[in-house]
Amino acid sequence: MNMNATILGQAIAFVIFVWFCMKYVWPPLMAAIEKRQKEISDGLASAERAKKDLDLAQANATDQLKKAKAEAQVIIEQANKRRSQILDEAKAEAEQERTKIVAQAQAEIDAERKRAREELRKQVAILAVAGAEKIIERSVDEAANSDIVDKLVAEL
């Protein structure tokens, strides 16, 4: 193998070129690559945190929705109970009012019946007295007595 000055010059130039690249070109390239790797890593970590935050927010929203539905169900049940209670109270009040009205009407009917009986007794007594007077005034004729009694019965 013949080594001549050209090969030796090329080897020295190559070593100087490698040293120059290692000293001045390689460090900025490595710094840029490391910076880019760090940015990508931070971006991925940020995306992962954002995904976890989103999952947590969705879970919280789901929990709040469930709580709201449960509270709404409780409110609906309370409203239904209150409605039933109001209906029962209204029915009881209406029943009491009906009983009161029926009792008043029955009392009025009884009072009217009693008054009518008293009036009828007075009229019967007056008619009996009038009939007795007529019987006494007339002769004791059987046909006349029977006629007067028939008239009295018809008037009663």
Curated annotation (Swiss-Prot):
One Gene Ontology cellular component: plasma membrane
SUPFAM superfamilies assigned to the protein according to its UniProt record, in alphabetical order: F1F0 ATP synthase subunit B, membrane domain
Transmembrane spans: 11-31
Keyword Cell division applies: no
Membrane topology: Single-pass membrane protein
CDD domains cross-referenced by the UniProt entry: ATP-synt_Fo_b
Keywords associated with the record: ATP synthesis, Cell inner membrane, Cell membrane, CF(0), Hydrogen ion transport, Ion transport, Membrane, Transmembrane, Transmembrane helix, Transport
Gene Ontology molecular function terms on file: proton-transporting ATP synthase activity, rotational mechanism; proton-transporting ATPase activity, rotational mechanism
Localization, UniProt: Cell inner membrane
Family annotation (HAMAP family): ATP_synth_b_bprime
Family: Belongs to the ATPase B chain family.
Subunit structure: F-type ATPases have 2 components, F(1) - the catalytic core - and F(0) - the membrane proton channel. F(1) has five subunits: alpha(3), beta(3), gamma(1), delta(1), epsilon(1). F(0) has three main subunits: a(1), b(2) and c(10-14). The alpha and beta chains form an alternating ring which encloses part of the gamma chain. F(1) is attached to F(0) by a central stalk formed by the gamma and epsilon chains, while a peripheral stalk is formed by the delta and b chains.
Functional description taken from the UniProt entry: F(1)F(0) ATP synthase produces ATP from ADP in the presence of a proton or sodium gradient. F-type ATPases consist of two structural domains, F(1) containing the extramembraneous catalytic core and F(0) containing the membrane proton channel, linked together by a central stalk and a peripheral stalk. During catalysis, ATP synthesis in the catalytic domain of F(1) is coupled via a rotary mechanism of the central stalk subunits to proton translocation.
Xref: PANTHER family: ATP SYNTHASE SUBUNIT B, ATP SYNTHASE SUBUNIT B', CHLOROPLASTIC
Protein's recorded name: ATP synthase subunit b
Native species: Klebsiella pneumoniae (strain 342)
Encoding gene per record: atpF
